[in-house]
Structure formats: C-alpha cells, structure tokens
Amino acid sequence: MKQIQVNLGVRSYPIYIGQNLMSDGETLSRYLLKKRILIVTNETVAPLYLKQIQETMASFGEVESVILPDGEQFKDLAHLDTIFTALLQQNYGRDSVLVALGGGVIGDMTGFAAACYQRGIDFIQIPTTLLSQVDSSVGGKTAVNHPLGKNMIGAFYQPQIVLIDTLCLHTLPAREFAAGMAEVIKYGIMWDADFFQWLEDNVTTLKTLDAQALVYAISRCCEIKADVVSQDETEQGVRALLNLGHTFGHAIEAEMGYGNWLHGEAVSAGTVLAAQTAKALGLIDESIVCRIIQLLQAFDLPVSAPESMDFDSFIQHMRRDKKVLGGQIRLVLPTAIGRADVFSQVTESTLEQVIRCA
C-alpha cells in the first residue's frame, strides 16, 4: 500500500493507494469510531461496492446510505438537497461523517454537502473512477454545476482521508478509463516531462490494467496534486496550472449538455486547443503539439472539439470561467512538455483563429 500526505497544517490528510482497501477496516478505523456514517453513492456504483463498504464500516457505527442517479447532469442543487434531506430526516449531528463512494460527481457533491451541513462535518473520499482517483478526490474542491457554468457553486473543503482501491478500475467501462487518462496525461504536460515520457512508453501496459503500472501512475498524479495543493490550497497561484485544458473543456461540457461529453473527454479536446493556442503564440512548436495529440489518441480520447461548436459558442462560456479576472480570460498553456503557465493577455482574435482552424 502506498501512502501520500497532503500537507495543510491542521487540515492535512493521507492518501492510501493499493488493492482491496475497501475491505481494510484498520485503515479506516480512526476516522469512523463513534460516528454515524452516511455513504453517498450512485446507481452504478452501489450494486458493485456498497455492500462491501457497508460491511467494512458496520463495526464502527451506524451506517446508512443515499443512492443518487449516475451522471454529470445530476450534479446540481436539486440532487445535493437529497443528501441534506437524508441527513436532516435521520437527525445526523456534527459528529457524523459522510463517505463519498463513486466518481468525481459523487465526490464533489458529498464534499460540498459536508462543507455546508451544520457548517461542516467530516467526510471521506473513496473514489472509484480513474479520473476521481488521480484528480478530483484530492485537494478539497467541492461543487455543483449550474446551467450557466460548471462547478460555479462550491467550496474548498478537505476530506479526512482519500482511500484509492485500484481494483475498482476493473469494473470501470473503457470509455471512463480513457476519460481518466486525460487527467493523467495533463500532469505530465504541465508538471513532469519524465512522467509524460513514461506514459508514452506504457500505453499498452496501462490499457491492460497492469497493477504495478496503475499504482505508479495514480501515485505520481497524487504526488503532484498533493505538492501543488500544499503550496496553494485555494488556487491563488500555482494550483491554477491544474486547470490545463479545463477552460476550453468546461465550455464544451456546458455547451453540449452535462453528461453528453465526459469531463475527461472535454479536457482532452481542451488540452489540444490549449496546445494549439500555445503554438499560435510561439510558446511551443508543432512537435510538442503532435506529441500531446498522439498520446491522447493512444488512449482513445477525442482531440478536437464537437463540430457543432463554433467560436461564439466557446467564447460565451469562456467569459464566465472561474479564472476570469478583471474581465480577462486566463488560460493555462503549455510552454514545454513538463511546464505550463497562466496567460491573461491572449486576445479573442487569437482564440478565434485557433478555434476556427482546429
């Protein structure tokens, strides 16, 4: 079992990565003793793992569950209220703990519910998708979507522990695994050139779910994320680099309707647009763009935006992006494999040229 620490003073917490961790009551025990436990999961994950985690936690306290519909389109205030209703109807107090058992949608909603309920109760992340294991479960970003923008209503709120059981990936559909690889590749582009090279050399090994390769890839992503979050918890500086591909990607998700494009698929296409923007500005050359495209394609990810999206449909969403400051769109762009920076002087005419030529 691999352990990584997110260092945030009194809000520090461990990430555990390995196999069969959902049956490891000893690791969970210190976070559950004398607490009432409410597991939040969805209709896809519940038949696979809910009984197992309930049995693991039953010796520590009363365990109940809330099962939500599965999909990004349900990550909204209405379904968040389902969690609050369950907590209130069953008289959960401040000594309770919420457990997020699922992917990024479940993790984001459960974390936000924990941040809000009685002004804050404990929560535990047990991510079951590759995307949530390498990205959304770590760092304390919690939120729900709004029809006018993704993740626009939320809070920074850290979990007590992140428990990553890599065996969950064996029940993950191939499309979901590919979507998670978009975030894995992002870390190589924006932070670690050697890791990017390792990914290029291990495509087949990862796609066949080799246990050692999965633990290494997930661990490296979590190490990078933990390092970045420890430096900049609330995204005032370096943490913004983790948004590589996300400004374009969130525009795709919002325009196409949440759930039609998976988050990772939109990030993949958005990462290519970010690379093409960087090339248009003279920050990188064509060879780097090609390496990025080839690696994304190797994992069966989209490398272009939907044909139905034009510049106008992109820009209306990008102007509402959370990173906008003083009315200026701020983009994370690669400056090399393994390096990225935030740019706020990219003109809309440059963006139009890139989007029209993509």
From Swiss-Prot:
Biological or metabolic pathway of the protein: Metabolic intermediate biosynthesis; chorismate biosynthesis; chorismate from D-erythrose 4-phosphate and phosphoenolpyruvate: step 2/7
Job of this protein: Catalyzes the conversion of 3-deoxy-D-arabino-heptulosonate 7-phosphate (DAHP) to dehydroquinate (DHQ).
Protein name: 3-dehydroquinate synthase
Encoding gene (name): aroB
Key word Lyase present: yes
Keywords, alphabetical: Amino-acid biosynthesis, Aromatic amino acid biosynthesis, Cobalt, Cytoplasm, Lyase, Metal-binding, NAD, Nucleotide-binding, Zinc
Reaction catalyzed: 7-phospho-2-dehydro-3-deoxy-D-arabino-heptonate = 3-dehydroquinate + phosphate
Cofactor(s), by name: Co(2+); Zn(2+); NAD(+)
Xref: Gene3D superfamilies: 3.40.50.1970, Dehydroquinate synthase-like - alpha domain
Annotated organism of origin: Shewanella baltica (strain OS185)
Record family assignment: Belongs to the sugar phosphate cyclases superfamily. Dehydroquinate synthase family.
Residues the record lists as binding Zn(2+): 183, 246, 263
Cofactor note: Binds 1 divalent metal cation per subunit. Can use either Co(2+) or Zn(2+).
UniProt cross-references to PANTHER family, sorted A to Z: 3-DEHYDROQUINATE SYNTHASE, 3-DEHYDROQUINATE SYNTHASE, CHLOROPLASTIC
Localization annotation: Cytoplasm
Keyword check for Acyltransferase: no
Transmembrane segments: none
GO MF assignments: 3-dehydroquinate synthase activity; metal ion binding; nucleotide binding
UniProt-annotated binding residues for NAD(+): 70-75, 104-108, 128-129, 141, 150, 168-171
HAMAP family attached to this UniProt entry: DHQ_synthase (MF_00110)
GO biological process terms on file: amino acid biosynthetic process; aromatic amino acid family biosynthetic process; chorismate biosynthetic process
One Gene Ontology CC term in the entry: cytoplasm
UniProt cross-references to SUPFAM superfamilies, sorted A to Z: Dehydroquinate synthase-like
CDD domains: DHQS (cd08195)
Record-listed E.C. numbers: 4.2.3.4
